[in-house]
Structures are given as C-alpha cells and as structure tokens.
C-alpha cells in the first residue's frame, strides 16, 4: 500500500493546482476509481471542478472528503526543492500540498481501492467528495456539492475529512468539530474636517474608542466541554486620508469572531448592534458568516476512527475542536457525523511543506480499517 500511496501523492503534487485550478488532479483520481466500478459524477461551478464518486447504493453512506487545490508557493527560491517536484529526502515527501492535503487524499483513494478490491460486494456506500475550491473562496466547492445532494435527497451518514489534524505525531489529534466563523465589516461615520478646527468636524476614531474597548473586552461565553470560549479579534482598521491635517470622515474596522455552540450568529449580530447604539454611533455593518459551529459527539464514526488509530498506529487521539474552519462545516449541514484526521500540520502553507512517507502509509491503513469498522469485511 505504501508505494501506491506515495506514487499517487507525487503525481498529484507535481500538478501545480493553485486554487481553484485543479490541473487534472481529479481526472487522475476519477480514472482510478472508474476501474473499480465507482460511479463518477462531475459537479463543476464556474472555475471550480468537483468530483462526487460512489461505490454501492445502500446505507450507510461513508464519505471521504478532500481538496486538490493548494495555496501559492511564495518565493520558490526559498524552498530546498522545487515545490512541485515532489522529491523524497530521508523518507520525507516535499512539495506544496504534501500535507495539505494531497498526501491524505492519496491515502484515502488507495484505502478505498484496497477495501473495494477485498470487498466488492460490501455493505453500504463508499463515497468521495473532492473539490478544487477549499483554499481560496470556498464558494463553488463542497458547499455547492452539498446543496446539490440535499436538493435531490441524497445524504451522507459518516464523513472523514482528510485535513492535516495531527500535531506532534500522526493521529494524536482528531478534530470532531469546528468553531463557527463570522466577520463584521464596520463603517463608523464622522464628519471630515481640518485638524485645527475640530469643532467643525466629528472624529469617528475618537467617537469609537469606548465602543472598541467594550467590543474587544466583552466575554461572549465560557465555552463548554467541547469548545473553548468564543474569541474576537480586530483584523483590519483604517481611517483618514494619509494627511496629518485632516480629521477622517469615516472609520473602518474589520473584526472576526470564532464562536462556539454557546452563542449563535444572530446573538452576535444583535449584541454588536446593541453596543453600537449604546455609544450613539452612526454606522453601517456588513456581516459575512463563513460557517456555523458543528460538533460530532462520540458515536459510530468517532468510535470507528479511534479504534482504527489504536489498532493500526497504537495511539489514542485527543478530540479537539480548535483551529480554523474546514469544509466539514458544510457536510455537517447534511446531518452527517464528521471528523477530521490527517497528517501533521507543522509545515502546511509554509516553505518546504512536507509529510512523512511512513505516516502516509499508516494513514492509508487507518482509513482502510475505518471502512472495515463501519461497513464490515
């Protein structure tokens, strides 16, 4: 299994699939799956290519989810090896996307292949949902596929997302949920004027200071047994023309909240509006909800994944809901149990991104064993 996974991972890495350009990665995957009798369906939206592949027609539906797109490489001269050469040095596979997430994608594909070869008449359905739009806008990828599947009554019961979840060793962390993410673009109005004549102007920065203090110090909740407390961070702030003698006419503040299941996006919006009105500010605010929080409590999927890690890798994982958002947030809307398990995340989005070849082989075995645990032999 190891050589098959590594060879496929190298093939995928050598395709410079900067989001949302798939560069033929999904075609390679589709051709492999077709040979095993998978039904292949292409769901393309705008510049994004999405693949929905299935083997079987009954319940439960066990899906693997992942993405073929990668982030830009940055200055390629800073890499020890060309970022799309997929070189292996001391058992480490180097390249953009090696850890995030072409390595785990290869492990998923080979695990599914091996399982189907051994169990051609398996129970349930094995599915793969693969997109080329995860790293950038994430507007035409998994979310659109999920919407299409739900519209025609298709469901997913269990889904493993191959995002790089591991911290210090393979399998030490399994993500069983994610916080929600909501961004506010706030415009506070003032009256522009000359700094020497402040009585003829109204400085929105000065007016907003007490509000900003309250916004950044407010305790939204205390978290719970599954999630850390909700946090807010100001990401961008701007006012003025660049001149030192002009009072700005508008203050722009962009802030983001990563929120847990103790609050809702509506509560957040209402509380911010309440603060703004309390401080008598004239404003406009635009909200962007990237995703609601989701949680998979201990059940069939988590048990299957944990048992696979213990039997194959000899490790009992920590369950965690921290970090950023993932496409799991869209799949959870289907009512599916969703967990994330993938390689180490220490080098993702960095120069010299890499993954252990040994880890990829182990990951493939873990994924295959998960299928055995859920669908039987």
Curated annotation (Swiss-Prot):
This is Succinyl-diaminopimelate desuccinylase. The keyword Metal-binding applies. Its cofactor is Zn(2+); Co(2+). The keyword Phosphoprotein does not apply. It comes from Mannheimia succiniciproducens (strain KCTC 0769BP / MBEL55E). InterPro entries: ArgE/DapE_CS, Bact_exopeptidase_dim_dom, DapE_proteobac, Peptidase_M20, Peptidase_M20_dimer, Peptidase_M20A. Its EC number is 3.5.1.18. PROSITE patterns: ARGE_DAPE_CPG2_1. GO terms for biological process: diaminopimelate biosynthetic process; L-arginine biosynthetic process; lysine biosynthetic process via diaminopimelate. The active site is at 69, 134 (proton acceptor). CDD domains: M20_DapE_proteobac. Binds 2 Zn(2+) or Co(2+) ions per subunit. Zn(2+) 2 binds at residues 100, 135, 349. Zn(2+) 1 binds at residues 67, 100, 163.
